[in-house]
UniProtKB/Swiss-Prot annotation:
Keywords: ATP synthesis, ATP-binding, Cell membrane, CF(1), Hydrogen ion transport, Ion transport, Membrane, Nucleotide-binding, Translocase, Transport. NCBIfam families: atpD (TIGR01039). It is found in: Cell membrane. GO terms for molecular function: ATP binding; ATP hydrolysis activity; proton-transporting ATP synthase activity, rotational mechanism. It holds the Pfam family ATP-synt_ab_N. This is ATP synthase subunit beta. The lineage of its organism: Bacteria, Bacillati, Actinomycetota, Actinomycetes, Micrococcales.
Protein backbone atom coordinates (compact mmCIF):
# COMPACT_ATOMS: atom_id res chain seq x y z
CA UNK A 1 0.00 0.00 0.00
CA UNK A 2 1.27 3.49 -0.80
CA UNK A 3 1.02 6.45 1.53
CA UNK A 4 -1.41 9.38 1.55
CA UNK A 5 -4.44 7.29 2.61
CA UNK A 6 -6.68 9.32 4.92
CA UNK A 7 -8.39 7.91 8.01
CA UNK A 8 -10.47 9.32 10.86
CA UNK A 9 -9.99 9.14 14.62
CA UNK A 10 -12.74 7.12 16.32
CA UNK A 11 -11.36 6.80 19.87
CA UNK A 12 -8.69 8.47 22.04
CA UNK A 13 -7.65 6.65 25.25
CA UNK A 14 -4.67 8.40 26.80
CA UNK A 15 -1.79 7.97 24.37
CA UNK A 16 -3.57 5.21 22.39
CA UNK A 17 -5.61 6.37 19.40
CA UNK A 18 -7.93 4.18 17.27
CA UNK A 19 -8.19 5.25 13.62
CA UNK A 20 -10.64 4.05 10.94
CA UNK A 21 -9.52 3.67 7.30
CA UNK A 22 -11.32 2.44 4.20
CA UNK A 23 -10.85 -1.31 3.62
CA UNK A 24 -8.35 -1.01 0.75
CA UNK A 25 -6.21 1.60 2.48
CA UNK A 26 -5.31 0.04 5.84
CA UNK A 27 -1.77 1.08 6.91
CA UNK A 28 0.74 -1.60 7.87
CA UNK A 29 1.93 -2.27 11.41
CA UNK A 30 4.69 0.23 12.41
CA UNK A 31 3.52 2.72 9.75
CA UNK A 32 3.69 6.35 10.87
CA UNK A 33 0.45 8.35 10.69
CA UNK A 34 0.31 12.15 10.93
CA UNK A 35 -2.34 14.53 12.20
CA UNK A 36 -2.33 18.13 13.38
CA UNK A 37 -3.77 19.86 16.41
CA UNK A 38 -4.03 23.52 17.38
CA UNK A 39 -2.69 24.35 20.84
CA UNK A 40 -2.66 27.95 22.10
CA UNK A 41 -2.85 29.24 18.53
CA UNK A 42 0.07 27.07 17.40
CA UNK A 43 -0.30 24.23 14.88
CA UNK A 44 1.46 21.07 16.15
CA UNK A 45 2.04 17.86 14.18
CA UNK A 46 1.38 14.62 16.05
CA UNK A 47 2.88 11.29 14.93
CA UNK A 48 1.01 8.04 15.59
CA UNK A 49 2.57 4.60 15.07
CA UNK A 50 0.34 1.67 14.10
CA UNK A 51 0.55 -1.09 16.72
CA UNK A 52 -2.46 -3.36 16.01
CA UNK A 53 -5.10 -4.16 13.42
CA UNK A 54 -8.41 -4.52 15.29
CA UNK A 55 -10.65 -5.63 12.40
CA UNK A 56 -13.62 -3.66 11.02
CA UNK A 57 -11.11 -1.37 9.23
CA UNK A 58 -9.76 -0.09 12.56
CA UNK A 59 -6.10 0.27 13.53
CA UNK A 60 -4.84 0.97 17.04
CA UNK A 61 -1.95 3.42 17.22
CA UNK A 62 0.42 4.75 19.87
CA UNK A 63 1.05 8.52 19.96
CA UNK A 64 4.59 9.90 20.00
CA UNK A 65 3.43 13.23 21.47
CA UNK A 66 0.71 14.29 23.89
CA UNK A 67 -2.81 13.62 22.55
CA UNK A 68 -4.28 16.77 24.15
CA UNK A 69 -6.65 18.44 21.68
CA UNK A 70 -7.33 15.41 19.45
CA UNK A 71 -11.03 14.89 18.66
CA UNK A 72 -13.13 12.11 17.14
CA UNK A 73 -13.64 12.46 13.42
CA UNK A 74 -10.33 14.28 12.94
CA UNK A 75 -8.42 13.39 9.76
CA UNK A 76 -5.22 11.31 9.95
CA UNK A 77 -2.78 10.84 7.05
CA UNK A 78 -0.89 7.58 6.46
CA UNK A 79 2.72 8.38 5.48
CA UNK A 80 3.15 4.93 3.91
CA UNK A 81 6.35 4.22 5.86
CA UNK A 82 7.89 3.91 9.29
CA UNK A 83 9.04 6.73 11.57
CA UNK A 84 12.32 8.02 10.11
CA UNK A 85 15.17 9.99 11.66
CA UNK A 86 17.98 12.01 10.05
CA UNK A 87 21.41 10.35 9.82
CA UNK A 88 24.92 11.49 8.94
CA UNK A 89 27.44 14.13 10.01
CA UNK A 90 24.76 16.82 10.26
CA UNK A 91 23.33 15.05 13.33
CA UNK A 92 26.48 15.74 15.40
CA UNK A 93 26.04 18.52 17.91
CA UNK A 94 22.26 18.30 17.59
CA UNK A 95 19.55 17.27 20.05
CA UNK A 96 16.59 15.35 18.61
CA UNK A 97 13.26 14.00 19.75
CA UNK A 98 12.00 10.51 18.88
CA UNK A 99 10.70 11.50 15.41
CA UNK A 100 13.95 13.24 14.42
CA UNK A 101 12.92 16.87 15.01
CA UNK A 102 15.82 19.10 16.07
CA UNK A 103 15.33 20.59 19.54
CA UNK A 104 18.35 22.94 19.53
CA UNK A 105 17.98 24.54 16.09
CA UNK A 106 17.98 28.11 17.53
CA UNK A 107 15.80 29.22 14.63
CA UNK A 108 18.09 27.75 11.94
CA UNK A 109 16.54 25.92 9.00
CA UNK A 110 18.53 22.68 9.20
CA UNK A 111 18.54 20.34 6.20
CA UNK A 112 19.47 16.66 6.33
CA UNK A 113 20.47 14.67 3.25
CA UNK A 114 19.27 11.27 4.39
CA UNK A 115 16.63 9.72 6.65
CA UNK A 116 16.49 6.09 7.83
CA UNK A 117 13.61 4.06 9.26
CA UNK A 118 13.97 3.34 12.99
CA UNK A 119 12.78 -0.26 12.40
CA UNK A 120 15.73 -2.06 10.86
CA UNK A 121 16.93 -5.65 10.76
CA UNK A 122 20.11 -6.64 12.65
CA UNK A 123 23.21 -7.29 10.48
CA UNK A 124 23.41 -10.68 8.78
CA UNK A 125 25.51 -13.38 10.45
CA UNK A 126 28.11 -13.30 7.66
CA UNK A 127 28.83 -9.60 8.38
CA UNK A 128 29.40 -9.98 12.13
CA UNK A 129 32.84 -9.45 13.67
CA UNK A 130 34.12 -12.39 15.72
CA UNK A 131 37.28 -10.75 17.11
CA UNK A 132 37.27 -9.99 20.85
CA UNK A 133 39.24 -6.95 21.97
CA UNK A 134 39.48 -5.15 25.32
CA UNK A 135 38.12 -1.58 25.44
CA UNK A 136 40.35 0.44 27.77
CA UNK A 137 38.56 3.13 29.81
CA UNK A 138 41.31 4.43 32.13
CA UNK A 139 39.08 3.67 35.15
CA UNK A 140 41.00 1.23 37.38
CA UNK A 141 38.14 -0.81 38.85
CA UNK A 142 36.57 -1.34 35.41
CA UNK A 143 39.75 -2.12 33.45
CA UNK A 144 41.04 -4.55 36.09
CA UNK A 145 37.97 -6.44 37.32
CA UNK A 146 35.19 -5.99 34.76
CA UNK A 147 37.00 -5.26 31.45
CA UNK A 148 34.78 -3.94 28.67
CA UNK A 149 34.63 -5.46 25.18
CA UNK A 150 35.18 -3.35 22.05
CA UNK A 151 31.83 -3.60 20.26
CA UNK A 152 30.23 -5.22 23.30
CA UNK A 153 27.19 -4.45 25.41
CA UNK A 154 27.90 -3.18 28.90
CA UNK A 155 25.33 -2.75 31.66
CA UNK A 156 25.61 -0.30 34.57
CA UNK A 157 23.29 -1.72 37.22
CA UNK A 158 22.27 0.11 40.36
CA UNK A 159 19.42 1.49 42.43
CA UNK A 160 18.50 5.15 42.66
CA UNK A 161 21.29 7.62 43.46
CA UNK A 162 24.39 5.38 43.30
CA UNK A 163 26.01 7.11 40.31
CA UNK A 164 24.81 5.47 37.05
CA UNK A 165 24.25 8.71 35.13
CA UNK A 166 27.48 10.30 36.42
CA UNK A 167 29.45 7.22 35.27
CA UNK A 168 27.76 7.40 31.84
CA UNK A 169 28.73 11.09 31.59
CA UNK A 170 32.27 10.20 32.68
CA UNK A 171 32.52 7.57 29.94
CA UNK A 172 31.29 10.03 27.28
CA UNK A 173 34.04 12.46 28.35
CA UNK A 174 36.75 9.75 28.35
CA UNK A 175 35.73 8.27 25.01
CA UNK A 176 35.81 11.67 23.31
CA UNK A 177 39.21 12.47 24.85
CA UNK A 178 41.00 9.13 24.48
CA UNK A 179 39.32 7.28 21.62
CA UNK A 180 37.94 9.95 19.28
CA UNK A 181 35.13 8.59 17.12
CA UNK A 182 31.44 9.33 17.39
CA UNK A 183 29.09 9.04 20.34
CA UNK A 184 25.31 8.76 20.25
CA UNK A 185 23.31 9.33 23.45
CA UNK A 186 19.76 8.10 24.03
CA UNK A 187 17.97 9.67 26.99
CA UNK A 188 15.17 7.18 27.68
CA UNK A 189 12.64 8.33 30.26
CA UNK A 190 15.14 10.11 32.49
CA UNK A 191 14.92 13.51 34.19
CA UNK A 192 14.92 16.59 31.96
CA UNK A 193 17.35 18.26 34.39
CA UNK A 194 19.89 15.48 33.72
CA UNK A 195 19.56 16.11 29.99
CA UNK A 196 20.26 19.83 30.47
CA UNK A 197 23.24 19.07 32.73
CA UNK A 198 24.64 16.55 30.24
CA UNK A 199 24.45 18.98 27.31
CA UNK A 200 26.15 21.79 29.28
CA UNK A 201 28.91 19.48 30.54
CA UNK A 202 29.54 18.16 27.03
CA UNK A 203 29.75 21.71 25.68
CA UNK A 204 32.21 22.66 28.46
CA UNK A 205 34.32 19.57 27.71
CA UNK A 206 34.35 20.28 23.97
CA UNK A 207 32.78 16.92 23.01
CA UNK A 208 29.26 18.12 22.14
CA UNK A 209 30.07 18.55 18.43
CA UNK A 210 31.07 14.87 18.16
CA UNK A 211 27.84 13.58 19.68
CA UNK A 212 24.25 13.13 18.51
CA UNK A 213 21.69 13.20 21.32
CA UNK A 214 18.15 11.83 21.21
CA UNK A 215 15.80 12.45 24.12
CA UNK A 216 12.46 11.01 25.17
CA UNK A 217 12.17 12.21 28.73
CA UNK A 218 10.16 11.28 31.81
CA UNK A 219 7.29 13.68 31.06
CA UNK A 220 6.68 12.31 27.54
CA UNK A 221 4.15 9.63 26.49
CA UNK A 222 5.16 5.94 26.80
CA UNK A 223 5.30 5.54 23.00
CA UNK A 224 8.11 8.10 22.86
CA UNK A 225 10.09 6.38 25.62
CA UNK A 226 9.62 3.00 23.92
CA UNK A 227 10.95 4.18 20.53
CA UNK A 228 13.64 6.74 21.41
CA UNK A 229 16.35 4.09 21.89
CA UNK A 230 15.61 2.79 18.36
CA UNK A 231 15.91 6.33 16.95
CA UNK A 232 19.35 6.77 18.54
CA UNK A 233 20.46 3.28 17.49
CA UNK A 234 19.52 4.05 13.87
CA UNK A 235 21.83 7.10 13.88
CA UNK A 236 24.61 4.94 15.37
CA UNK A 237 24.09 2.26 12.68
CA UNK A 238 24.63 4.84 9.93
CA UNK A 239 28.01 5.86 11.39
CA UNK A 240 28.99 2.17 11.64
CA UNK A 241 27.66 0.86 8.31
CA UNK A 242 28.06 3.83 5.93
CA UNK A 243 30.88 5.90 7.44
CA UNK A 244 32.73 2.79 8.74
CA UNK A 245 33.38 4.33 12.15
CA UNK A 246 33.55 2.85 15.64
CA UNK A 247 30.60 4.24 17.57
CA UNK A 248 29.72 4.50 21.24
CA UNK A 249 26.03 4.27 22.05
CA UNK A 250 24.96 5.42 25.52
CA UNK A 251 21.47 4.53 26.74
CA UNK A 252 20.17 6.03 29.97
CA UNK A 253 18.02 4.22 31.12
CA UNK A 254 17.11 0.76 29.79
CA UNK A 255 14.68 0.16 32.67
CA UNK A 256 12.58 3.12 31.45
CA UNK A 257 12.48 1.48 28.00
CA UNK A 258 11.05 -1.66 29.63
CA UNK A 259 8.68 0.42 31.77
CA UNK A 260 7.38 2.25 28.68
CA UNK A 261 6.78 -1.11 26.96
CA UNK A 262 4.75 -2.20 29.98
CA UNK A 263 2.62 0.97 29.85
CA UNK A 264 2.02 0.65 26.10
CA UNK A 265 1.20 -3.06 26.48
CA UNK A 266 -1.44 -2.30 29.12
CA UNK A 267 -2.96 0.49 27.01
CA UNK A 268 -3.12 -1.90 24.04
CA UNK A 269 -5.11 -4.35 26.17
CA UNK A 270 -2.56 -7.17 26.43
CA UNK A 271 -2.72 -9.44 29.47
CA UNK A 272 0.27 -8.65 31.72
CA UNK A 273 2.96 -11.19 32.59
CA UNK A 274 5.10 -11.55 35.76
CA UNK A 275 5.09 -8.52 38.11
CA UNK A 276 2.83 -6.65 35.67
CA UNK A 277 5.37 -6.51 32.82
CA UNK A 278 4.41 -6.92 29.17
CA UNK A 279 4.12 -10.54 27.89
CA UNK A 280 6.55 -9.75 25.03
CA UNK A 281 9.29 -8.30 27.30
CA UNK A 282 12.03 -10.67 26.07
CA UNK A 283 11.07 -10.03 22.43
CA UNK A 284 11.11 -6.21 22.80
CA UNK A 285 14.48 -6.33 24.54
CA UNK A 286 15.89 -8.66 21.87
CA UNK A 287 14.78 -6.39 19.00
CA UNK A 288 16.84 -3.55 20.50
CA UNK A 289 19.86 -5.51 21.72
CA UNK A 290 20.39 -7.66 18.61
CA UNK A 291 20.98 -4.54 16.50
CA UNK A 292 23.77 -3.37 18.83
CA UNK A 293 26.71 -5.34 17.46
CA UNK A 294 30.03 -5.23 15.58
CA UNK A 295 30.34 -5.75 11.86
CA UNK A 296 33.61 -6.48 10.02
CA UNK A 297 36.14 -4.00 11.38
CA UNK A 298 33.57 -1.56 12.81
CA UNK A 299 31.67 -1.62 16.05
CA UNK A 300 28.89 -0.18 18.14
CA UNK A 301 29.95 -0.39 21.78
CA UNK A 302 26.98 0.31 24.00
CA UNK A 303 26.94 1.43 27.61
CA UNK A 304 23.52 1.03 29.16
CA UNK A 305 22.43 2.35 32.54
CA UNK A 306 19.94 -0.04 34.11
CA UNK A 307 17.91 1.03 37.15
CA UNK A 308 17.26 -1.87 39.53
CA UNK A 309 13.86 -1.36 41.20
CA UNK A 310 14.15 -1.66 45.01
CA UNK A 311 17.69 -3.09 44.45
CA UNK A 312 16.01 -6.38 43.38
CA UNK A 313 18.12 -8.06 40.68
CA UNK A 314 15.49 -10.80 40.20
CA UNK A 315 12.99 -8.24 38.87
CA UNK A 316 12.13 -9.24 35.24
CA UNK A 317 13.36 -5.90 33.79
CA UNK A 318 17.05 -6.15 34.87
CA UNK A 319 16.97 -9.98 34.69
CA UNK A 320 15.94 -9.90 30.99
CA UNK A 321 18.74 -7.46 30.19
CA UNK A 322 21.46 -9.61 31.83
CA UNK A 323 21.27 -12.24 29.07
CA UNK A 324 22.38 -9.75 26.38
CA UNK A 325 25.38 -8.20 28.14
CA UNK A 326 29.12 -8.86 27.72
CA UNK A 327 30.05 -7.07 30.95
CA UNK A 328 28.08 -5.93 33.98
CA UNK A 329 29.21 -3.13 36.26
CA UNK A 330 27.14 -3.29 39.44
CA UNK A 331 27.03 -0.14 41.54
CA UNK A 332 26.69 -0.72 45.27
CA UNK A 333 24.82 1.47 47.74
CA UNK A 334 27.10 0.18 50.54
CA UNK A 335 30.26 1.28 48.69
CA UNK A 336 28.67 4.64 47.75
CA UNK A 337 27.80 5.21 51.43
CA UNK A 338 31.55 4.97 52.26
CA UNK A 339 32.22 7.80 49.79
CA UNK A 340 34.14 5.51 47.42
CA UNK A 341 33.42 6.41 43.77
CA UNK A 342 32.91 4.98 41.21
CA UNK A 343 30.85 2.80 43.60
CA UNK A 344 31.48 -0.40 41.62
CA UNK A 345 30.99 -3.68 43.50
CA UNK A 346 34.19 -5.58 42.58
CA UNK A 347 32.81 -9.00 43.57
CA UNK A 348 29.37 -8.75 41.92
CA UNK A 349 30.53 -7.16 38.63
CA UNK A 350 31.36 -9.55 35.77
CA UNK A 351 32.89 -9.65 32.30
CA UNK A 352 32.99 -12.47 29.77
CA UNK A 353 36.55 -11.51 28.80
CA UNK A 354 37.96 -11.86 32.32
CA UNK A 355 39.89 -14.82 30.95
CA UNK A 356 43.65 -15.21 30.30
CA UNK A 357 43.13 -15.91 26.58
CA UNK A 358 41.60 -12.43 26.12
CA UNK A 359 43.38 -10.22 28.67
CA UNK A 360 46.68 -12.04 29.28
CA UNK A 361 47.98 -14.12 32.19
CA UNK A 362 49.31 -11.21 34.29
CA UNK A 363 46.07 -9.22 34.18
CA UNK A 364 44.01 -12.33 34.98
CA UNK A 365 46.30 -13.38 37.87
CA UNK A 366 46.17 -9.94 39.51
CA UNK A 367 42.37 -9.63 39.03
CA UNK A 368 41.76 -13.05 40.61
CA UNK A 369 44.13 -12.29 43.52
CA UNK A 370 42.36 -8.97 44.18
CA UNK A 371 38.97 -10.72 44.18
CA UNK A 372 40.26 -13.46 46.52
CA UNK A 373 41.58 -10.89 49.02
CA UNK A 374 38.30 -8.91 48.91
CA UNK A 375 36.23 -12.10 49.28
CA UNK A 376 38.30 -13.23 52.30
CA UNK A 377 37.89 -9.78 53.86
CA UNK A 378 34.12 -10.02 53.36
CA UNK A 379 34.08 -13.40 55.16
CA UNK A 380 36.12 -12.01 58.08
CA UNK A 381 33.98 -8.89 58.63
CA UNK A 382 31.42 -10.73 60.77
CA UNK A 383 34.18 -12.11 63.02
CA UNK A 384 35.74 -8.63 63.29
CA UNK A 385 32.34 -7.10 64.18
CA UNK A 386 31.83 -9.59 67.04
CA UNK A 387 35.35 -10.25 68.38
CA UNK A 388 37.47 -7.41 66.99
CA UNK A 389 40.42 -7.50 64.60
CA UNK A 390 42.89 -8.53 67.35
CA UNK A 391 41.31 -12.01 67.51
CA UNK A 392 42.32 -12.76 63.91
CA UNK A 393 45.45 -14.68 62.97
CA UNK A 394 48.46 -12.67 61.76
CA UNK A 395 47.82 -13.84 58.17
CA UNK A 396 44.17 -12.74 58.29
CA UNK A 397 45.12 -9.35 59.76
CA UNK A 398 47.50 -8.79 56.82
CA UNK A 399 44.73 -9.85 54.38
CA UNK A 400 42.25 -7.39 55.93
CA UNK A 401 44.81 -4.54 55.82
CA UNK A 402 45.56 -5.22 52.13
CA UNK A 403 41.84 -5.52 51.33
CA UNK A 404 41.25 -2.07 52.82
CA UNK A 405 44.07 -0.61 50.72
CA UNK A 406 42.64 -2.30 47.62
CA UNK A 407 39.14 -0.99 48.42
CA UNK A 408 40.49 2.57 48.73
CA UNK A 409 42.68 2.20 45.61
CA UNK A 410 39.64 1.10 43.56
CA UNK A 411 38.23 4.61 44.08
CA UNK A 412 39.37 7.20 41.55
CA UNK A 413 39.18 10.93 40.94
CA UNK A 414 36.91 11.35 37.90
CA UNK A 415 36.52 14.28 35.49
CA UNK A 416 32.79 14.61 36.16
CA UNK A 417 33.28 14.75 39.94
CA UNK A 418 35.81 17.61 39.83
CA UNK A 419 33.08 20.17 40.50
CA UNK A 420 32.24 18.31 43.76
CA UNK A 421 35.74 17.30 44.92
CA UNK A 422 37.96 19.99 43.43
CA UNK A 423 40.38 17.22 42.37
CA UNK A 424 41.30 16.81 38.70
CA UNK A 425 40.23 13.57 37.00
CA UNK A 426 42.80 10.92 36.12
CA UNK A 427 43.18 8.32 33.37
CA UNK A 428 45.26 5.32 34.46
CA UNK A 429 46.81 3.13 31.71
CA UNK A 430 45.92 -0.56 32.03
CA UNK A 431 49.50 -1.75 32.69
CA UNK A 432 49.89 0.83 35.45
CA UNK A 433 46.64 -0.39 37.02
CA UNK A 434 47.82 -4.03 36.92
CA UNK A 435 51.24 -3.14 38.39
CA UNK A 436 49.65 -1.04 41.16
CA UNK A 437 47.28 -3.74 42.38
CA UNK A 438 50.00 -6.39 42.01
CA UNK A 439 52.23 -4.35 44.33
CA UNK A 440 49.45 -4.07 46.96
CA UNK A 441 48.70 -7.82 46.77
CA UNK A 442 52.41 -8.70 47.19
CA UNK A 443 52.69 -6.47 50.26
CA UNK A 444 55.00 -3.85 48.70
CA UNK A 445 52.68 -1.10 49.99
CA UNK A 446 52.02 -2.45 53.50
CA UNK A 447 54.00 0.46 55.01
CA UNK A 448 51.73 3.10 53.39
CA UNK A 449 48.55 3.99 55.36
CA UNK A 450 45.26 3.24 53.64
CA UNK A 451 44.15 6.91 53.47
CA UNK A 452 46.94 7.55 50.94
CA UNK A 453 45.15 5.23 48.48
CA UNK A 454 41.83 7.12 48.54
CA UNK A 455 40.60 8.85 45.37
CA UNK A 456 43.90 8.76 43.45
CA UNK A 457 45.12 7.57 40.03
CA UNK A 458 48.18 5.29 39.92
CA UNK A 459 50.81 4.33 42.53
CA UNK A 460 52.78 7.53 41.80
CA UNK A 461 49.78 9.51 43.08
CA UNK A 462 49.71 7.29 46.19
CA UNK A 463 53.39 8.04 46.92
CA UNK A 464 52.84 11.78 46.40
CA UNK A 465 49.84 11.73 48.73
CA UNK A 466 51.82 9.71 51.33
CA UNK A 467 54.68 12.25 51.22
CA UNK A 468 52.16 15.06 51.68
CA UNK A 469 50.55 13.26 54.65
CA UNK A 470 53.97 12.72 56.26
CA UNK A 471 54.74 16.45 55.96
CA UNK A 472 51.36 17.36 57.48
CA UNK A 473 51.95 14.94 60.37
CA UNK A 474 55.39 16.47 60.89
Amino acid sequence: MTGDAVGRIVRVTGSVVDVEFSRNNLPGVFNALKTRVNRSGKEIEITLEVAQHLGDDLVRTVAMQSTDGLIRGQEVLDTGGHITVPVGDATKGRVFNVVGEVLNSNGEDIKFDEYWSIHRKPPEFSLLESKTQLFETGIKVIDLLTPYVQGGKIGLFGGAGVGKTVLIQEMIQRVAQDHGGVSVFAGVGERTREGNDLIREMQDAGVFDKTALVFGQMDEPPGTRLRVALSALTMAEYFRDVQKQDVLLFIDNIFRFTQAGSEVSTLLGRIPSAVGYQPNLADEMGVLQERITSTRGHSITSLQAIYVPADDYTDPAPATTFAHLDATTELSREIASKGLYPAVDPLASTSRILDPKYIGKDHYRVAVTVKQILQRDKELREIIAILGIDELSEEDRVTVARARRIEQFLSQNTYMAKKFTGVDGSTVPLQETIDGFDAICRGDCDHIPEQAFFNVGGLEDVERKWSKLQKELG
